[in-house]
Amino acid sequence: MYKQQRILFLTLYTFSLTGGIEKVCRSVIKMLSDLVVELCYHVDALSLYDHEKVDKYTPHVHFEYVKGNKIRFLWKALKAGSKADTIILSHINLLIFGLIIKKMRPKTRIILFAHGIEIWKKLSSWKRAFLSTNVEIWAVSTYTAMMIRDKHGIDRARIYILNNGLDPFLQPVPAFEKPDHLIQKHHLSGNHRILFTLARLSSSEQYKGYDIVLEAMRSLPSNVVYLLSGQADEAEKKRILKLIDDYQLNDRVRLTGFLPDDQLSDYYLLADIFVMPSLGEGFGITFIEAAAHGCPSVAGNLDGSRDALLNGRLGSLVDPKNVKEVASAIRTQLEKGRLPKHSLSLQQECLKHFSYQQHKLNFIHLL
């Protein structure tokens, strides 16, 4: 008799934040929802901190959120976990729940998504031991897999690669015209060449590379404008504004603040280059979002950005600590220009590897 596969997906956030990990969670929960119909799976999903859900991602999944109530989360996780064949954990901070369920049901399969910086930090001895013996680790990039192996001594054979993919509801743009309303909003003209970074601007991280871009701007033509977007804490905003002032870039840098998801497409179309020469990116979903809009990237060659850029096929990989190399790559990309045929080719290459359907096929293969 056929035994229905039961999956429990545990997350910290899925819909109430908009970072890279949350984008991954939204795609995963939509894939699991598809599998309920396609393979007759039973899927429960439980979020610790969410206070809302978006129904289009969860039509066939039993999704609950507990608004930060850890006791309620534990009770619901153990209840659903006692029946599940597979537990998928979206974050290392949920590992304790995998451990408890594994103690209750030793045959339960435990899968952990490993994104980047959150799992490169020092781990307690019990986490390292549990990861080494009882958990399948699905890393978002080759770099993240290597960091887990090197930092924690975990056998590389226990670590699988599942690159991130595009949102299931992202529609490839049919044309690559710059939006007039953003040109007007940011006081731009047809003569301006536009660099764009979308990142969390955090004083506690500072690995996204926008410092290097600001420094590189000093040697770039005066018609190059830099749009730096993302939520910033007060300390980091103050530091960035000082850099802009020190480099005399006040007329050439725009801090846009947080951009909601429904505005991102227009900003990717506005940009000539998406530039983020990071030093600690686990993957970088923004790189593939840019490419899906025909926008090439300049990224660092020392982290997971290499996977996102297909080792240079979706843009330029540079030493993220070398200002001259970053500036040179930007100049080279600007000289090429964003011709429609180039944008279309870039978009097609991106969709071939990172479309939602391809992401789902890769996910099912590992599952």
Placement of each model-derived feature along the sequence:
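Aromatic "clamp/platform" in nucleotide-sugar-dependent glycosyltransferases that forms part
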Residues: 279
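Short alpha-helical donor nucleotide-sugar binding micro-motif in glycosyltransferases
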Residues: 258-259, 266-271
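Nucleotide-activated donor-binding/catalytic signature segment of Leloir-type glycosyltransferases, i.e.
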Residues: 238-259
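Carbohydrate-associated surface elements
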Residues: 143, 165
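Glycosyltransferase donor-sugar binding loop
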Residues: 45-50, 198-201, 225-241
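Conserved acidic donor-binding segment of nucleotide-sugar-dependent glycosyltransferases
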Residues: 311-312, 316-323, 332-337
